[in-house]
């Protein structure tokens, strides 16, 4: 399971006369039964809150030095990792002024942010410096941010300040509202620096970034950078250079200082939930207070939020690289869990955090700000999609080194922007449909889109544009307007986008494009698409609904194991998953390997393709796809477009091995080239690996196949002919076509000489059936043969036919127009004779001079044709004349040299 932050502090009752903080140690406690040992520690006065669980059945926690001796008395094995936290923190590297300047310059160059500086408390801002930053923002950007507004006052008479960023900051507008808070726990300043960095990003990029301008103009974005001023100032008084570990506020209860503000929110049923997610002992660090909203700070947040109708909120904490959503107080998901999961999945894809509820990822929590904001006061605050980012990894602790301040803020920049977007309208591509199953060179393709408004407000007047990212693709109709997409709804376009693949596009080539969604010229989202040219032929394809038919399944422990499920799939009715009912097991290895070898002999560039989704513990659990060329004796992990390098922790070993890990909640197609294994016999294996700790839903795969992409031949499925009303009618059809320039229709009256009767142009490449028709006057009596010369754009050709037409038509004398006309270098002249006799056909120039004799002699009755290929003649108009006893006719033709 995910690195779980559990900080175990032994409860030390702080009498009112005691103000000094003890030194702290970081210890690593080893446990064979985590739940049992935690229960035992609670009995001796241990409070469980924030810390870090290792993958060797250990918990790394901070303890007061005096409590380390108490730990020894329990008999639980432990190691001291940091013997003196204060000394350790003071020994952390400090950035020089030159190094600080370089970091800030890089921030300005890459993200346009230069306002964030380093504070004087270990690089973090003190409370006074936070207030000064808010004043500076107002002075620099008076038209974008309000003056700081006191929304409440603490017990020690310190104001709790909020500010709003918007295009009319001093006015209240009917715009979607988003909220960002930090420092509800006094020892977590990295969240505050992350929030202030985002504020500067909005302010300093307003005039240069259209998306930022749109958000500021169309949202009211509120910030409370420090909810707990008294606790934060107390840390400054004890540790002026940073590193203070005081967590709560400074109210006095039963002789002990402090209430955990993130356990003090209502309503009563949430605050007093039976899950034990807070302490009732005043000296404990997660003490919930004497009643819900007993503290001035939580009262201030409640009063501030009432009537604001916030749509989204991020309440920043540290640390553990998590994104936590409701419920914490109940061990079931909220009614809007699908929305929370979608938002969280999108956001963690940007920074690699792990999403889930507190009881899924950490421990039960009751009285939290997220639960209250979501549905704790529907009449007052409405429904706020509130979540908690836990910023920073294990080595960052509560006070990260100076070198980590900017990176932590930057890794949350895109999630912050996303959550401001979805407070209002935010439309992106949900899916697309093509009018062709496969795409080949020369294809003209139509695309219809299904767009989803992930936002919490209706989206109107949206523009969707198809952009080519390849020189092999030309967009002909690339824009569609979407009039309205309701909040959380979808819209399917009715007017298709169209594009053409170049005739010279190589087979088996990835052609990329992207769908850009915008409003008023401002890009909301961009989704990249890829199409592989050619038609796949499957070397191996699993079309079964039972993995045991093609795969050998093993599992340690014996269950759960790979099975078919009907509850989630890419193409129905099933997909394969490692844990059909619920989560995968701890310390599990679950494999699915092809039973029989797959031959790739004769294929130069085979591709493995499958659809997949997964949810595993980041950095520790994973899915691994492997290949073997020796019948399974040894296996090699395959890297794909969706894999990540293994962390080297837990079951993600060795480090750097390609794995599927973290969360990818939507079905995605994975395609992996197997060209390195061409002309060999292979086996494939899907393997889910987990260590001891967090468990999750696991790995899903569907539509597994190995394919080769090839050209589509011109496949003629029929070719027929008949005579009707003195006309020859030819009909033929194709099943598929590739690079087909057209069909030249050829005729023969004697079975040996072939003449062109006409030409039918084609459209290049088609993967669906096409019908063709050609007709002409009957050219003679007896057997007339026709054939088709199919010509590609590269000049190559292939003959189809012939078909025989039996003609008993009685012909009259006639001379027909030459074909082709104009012509160069040769043309064909057809003529009919009604009876046996002498015939002459001569060619004359425009002055009447005879330049060629084509026919001069006895001809049988019937249809005839003769070719004319000028030699030594100039371009121009020529006449040809047929003369027989009792018949003559002259026609004109054009020779273009």
Give the residues covered by each predicted segment.
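Metallocarboxypeptidase
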Residues: 26-28, 236-434, 475
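Extracellular glycan-recognition surfaces and repeat-rich motifs
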Residues: 539-589, 639-668, 837
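Short, compositionally biased serine/threonine- and acidic-rich segments at solvent-exposed termini, linkers
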Residues: 703-811
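Short, surface-exposed loop/turn motifs with a glycine/proline- and acidic-biased composition
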Residues: 761-786, 855-885, 890
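Terminal connector regions
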Residues: 497-536
């Amino acid at each position: 399971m995910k690195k779980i932050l559990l900080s175990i502090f032994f409860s030390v009752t702080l009498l009112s006369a005691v103000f000094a903080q003890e030194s702290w140690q970081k210890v690593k406690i080893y446990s064979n039964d985590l739940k049992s040992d935690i229960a035992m520690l609670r009995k001796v006065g241990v409070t469980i809150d924030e810390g870090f669980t290792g993958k060797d059945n250990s918990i790394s926690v901070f303890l007061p030095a005096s409590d380390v001796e108490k730990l020894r008395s329990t008999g639980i094995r432990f190691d001291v990792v940091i013997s003196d936290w204060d000394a350790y923190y003071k020994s952390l590297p400090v950035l020089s002024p030159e190094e600080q300047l370089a970091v800030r310059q890089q921030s300005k160059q890459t993200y346009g942010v230069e306002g964030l500086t380093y504070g004087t408390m270990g690089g973090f801002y003190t409370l006074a410096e936070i207030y000064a930053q808010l004043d500076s923002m107002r002075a620099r950007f008076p038209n974008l941010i309000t003056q700081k507004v006191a929304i409440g006052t603490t017990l020690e008479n310190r104001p709790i300040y909020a500010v709003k960023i918007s295009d009319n900051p001093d006015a209240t507008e009917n715009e979607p509202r988003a909220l960002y808070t930090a420092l509800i726990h006094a020892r977590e300043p990295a969240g505050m620096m992350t929030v202030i960095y985002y504020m500067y990003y909005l302010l300093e990029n307003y005039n240069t970034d259209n998306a930022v301008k749109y958000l500021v103009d169309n949202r009211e974005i509120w910030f409370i950078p420090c909810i707990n001023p008294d606790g934060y100032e107390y840390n400054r008084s004890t540790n002026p250079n940073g590193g203070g570990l005081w967590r709560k506020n400074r109210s006095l209860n039963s002789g002990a200082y402090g209430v955990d503000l993130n356990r003090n929110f209502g309503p009563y049923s949430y605050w007093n939930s039976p899950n034990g997610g807070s302490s009732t002992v005043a000296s404990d660090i997660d003490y919930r207070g004497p009643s819900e909203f007993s503290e001035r700070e939580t009262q201030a947040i409640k009063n501030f939020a009432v009537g604001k109708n916030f749509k989204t909120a991020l309440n920043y904490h540290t640390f553990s690289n998590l994104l936590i959503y409701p419920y914490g107080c109940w061990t079931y998901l909220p009614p809007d869990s699908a929305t929370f999961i979608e938002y969280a999945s999108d956001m963690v894809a940007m920074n690699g955090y792990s999403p889930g509820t507190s009881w899924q990822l950490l421990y039960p929590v009751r009285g939290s700000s997220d639960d209250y904001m979501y549905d704790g006061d529907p009449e007052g605050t409405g429904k706020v999609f509130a979540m908690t980012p836990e910023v920073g990894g294990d080595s960052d602790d509560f006070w990260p080194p100076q070198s980590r301040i900017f990176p932590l803020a930057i890794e949350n920049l895109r999630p912050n922007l996303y959550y401001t977007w979805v407070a209002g309208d935010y439309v992106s591509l949900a899916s697309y449909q093509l009018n062709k199953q496969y795409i080949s060179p020369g294809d003209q393709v139509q695309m219809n889109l299904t767009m989803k408004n992930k936002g919490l407000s209706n989206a109107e007047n949206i523009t969707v544009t198809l952009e080519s990212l390849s020189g092999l693709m030309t967009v002909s109709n690339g824009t569609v307007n979407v009039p309205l997409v309701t909040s959380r709804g979808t819209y399917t376009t009715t007017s298709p986008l169209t594009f053409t693949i170049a005739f010279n596009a190589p087979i088996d080539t990835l052609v990329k494009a992207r769908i850009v969604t915008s409003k008023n010229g401002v890009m909301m989202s961009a989704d990249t698409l890829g199409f592989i040219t050619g038609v796949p032929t499957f070397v191996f394809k699993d079309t079964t609904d039972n993995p045991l038919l093609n795969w050998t399944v093993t599992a340690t422990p014996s269950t759960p194991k790979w099975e078919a499920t009907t509850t989630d799939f890419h193409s129905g009715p099933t997909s394969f998953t490692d844990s059909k009912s619920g989560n995968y097991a701890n310390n599990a290895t679950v494999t699915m390997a092809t039973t029989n070898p797959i031959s790739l002999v004769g294929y130069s560039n085979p591709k493995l393709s499958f659809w997949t989704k997964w949810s595993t513990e980041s950095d520790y659990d994973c899915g691994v796809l492997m290949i073997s060329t020796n019948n399974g004796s040894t296996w090699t992990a395959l890297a794909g477009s969706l894999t990540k390098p293994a962390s080297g922790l837990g079951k993600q070993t060795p480090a750097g091995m390609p794995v599927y890990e973290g969360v990818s909640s939507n079905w995605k197609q994975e395609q992996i080239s197997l060209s390195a294994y061409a002309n060999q016999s292979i086996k494939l294996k899907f393997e889910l690996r987990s260590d001891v700790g967090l468990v999750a839903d696991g790995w899903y795969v569907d539509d597994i196949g190995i394919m080769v992409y090839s050209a589509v031949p011109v496949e003629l499925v029929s070719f027929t002919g008949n005579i009707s009303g003195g006309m020859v009618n030819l009909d033929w059809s194709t099943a598929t076509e590739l690079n087909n320039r057209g069909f030249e229709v050829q005729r023969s009256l004697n079975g040996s000489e072939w003449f062109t009767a006409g030409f039918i142009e084609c459209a290049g490449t088609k993967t669906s059936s096409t019908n063709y028709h050609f007709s002409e006057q009957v050219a003679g009596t007896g057997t007339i043969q026709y054939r088709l010369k199919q010509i590609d754009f590269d000049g190559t050709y292939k003959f189809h036919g012939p078909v025989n037409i039996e003609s008993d038509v009685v012909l009259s004398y006639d001379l027909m127009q030459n074909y082709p006309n104009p012509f160069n270098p040769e043309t064909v002249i057809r003529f009919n004779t009604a009876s046996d006799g002498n015939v002459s056909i001569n060619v004359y120039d425009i002055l009447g001079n005879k330049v060629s004799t084509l026919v001069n002699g006895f001809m049988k009755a019937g249809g005839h044709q003769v070719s004319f290929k000028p030699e030594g003649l100039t371009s121009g108009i020529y006449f040809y004349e047929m003369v027989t006893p009792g018949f003559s006719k002259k026609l004109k033709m054009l020779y273009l040299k």
